A protein has these predicted regions:
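N-terminal glycine-rich phosphate-binding loop and ensuing alpha1 helix
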Residues: 1-58
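Catalytic-core segments of class I nucleotidyltransferases/pyrophosphorylases
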Residues: 102, 109, 115-122, 134-137, ...
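Glycine-rich phosphate-binding loop at the start of an alpha helix
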Residues: 35, 87, 179
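Residues at the starts of beta-strands that form the adenosine-phosphate
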Residues: 2, 47-49, 73, 126-127, ...
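Conserved beta-loop-beta/alpha segment of the NTase-like Rossmann-fold superfamily
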Residues: 61, 65-142
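Small/polar loops that bind or transfer phosphate-bearing groups
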Residues: 6, 29, 51-53, 78, ...
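Phosphate- and divalent-cation-binding pockets in alpha/beta enzyme and binding domains
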Residues: 13, 59-62, 92, 113, ...
């Protein structure tokens, strides 16, 4: 199975740290954030990885190259300046990903074990996403658990999921966010969910990055 790490975002809220550096290359525990994802994927047995690039993408490519020195094989999906949003980036990379694949946001830090996603038996057109308890910056959440009524408590999308390639069937290339697609497919019962209680941090601001590094150093 292959995995895709989303790394094309502009990181506007992380300025000035992202003025000359893509957000996934910012250091957490003395390693680029995205390197933690690569190590976790490798530990789960996933060595074929696709990374999408836009803002300062050459910094990622120059650091990881083809991935061999990290024990993996990396392919890159180059996007237009400004990026294509999450779903647009996935759709652009579909020719590199195969029938079923895992996607991870490159700007989160987590100890979630993707081995669980690899064991799922998804039907054609389906997806499975990981939700987490709502952080302070997203108190209202994003999605209810799929086995509960839609009006149930909503949790925050972690940016981690597994998708069948035909989940995106009929969607044209271009700038396209993922949220509206997930909501539509949830209503069609094509998306299952789980709630993960564990380490997860969205590195959305310099303050959050500093807080995370302080915790990890303690």
């Amino acid at each position: 199975m292959k995995a895709m790490i989303l790394a094309a975002g502009r990181g506007q809220r992380m300025m000035p740290l992202t003025q000359n550096m893509p957000k996934p290359m910012l250091k957490v525990a003395e390693k680029p954030l995205i390197e933690h994802h690569i190590n976790n994927l490798k530990a789960a047995g996933i060595t074929d990885i696709v990374i999408n690039l836009a803002w300062q993408g050459d910094k990622i490519k120059d650091y990881f190259k083809d991935g061999r020195q990290f024990g993996v094989n990396i392919l890159y999906s180059q996007e237009v300046e400004g990026g294509l949003e999450t779903a647009g980036g996935i759709i652009e990379a579909l020719p590199l990903l195969g029938d079923s694949f895992i996607v991870i946001n490159g700007d989160v830090y987590t100890d979630y074990d993707v081995s669980a996603l690899m064991q799922l038996h998804l039907q054609p057109g389906e997806a499975h996403i990981v939700l987490i308890e709502n952080p302070p910056h997203n108190p209202d959440g994003d999605f209810a658990l799929s086995h509960l009524p839609a009006e149930s408590q909503k949790y925050t999308f972690s940016g981690i999921g597994r998708y069948k390639a035909d989940f995106f069937k009929g969607l044209t290339q271009g700038i396209r966010p993922l949220g509206p697609i997930l909501r539509e497919k949830l209503n069609e019962h094509l998306v299952s969910t789980e709630l993960y209680i564990g380490q997860w941090d969205d590195i959305g601001t310099p303050e959050r990055l500093n807080q995370l590094n302080t915790r990890l150093e303690a």
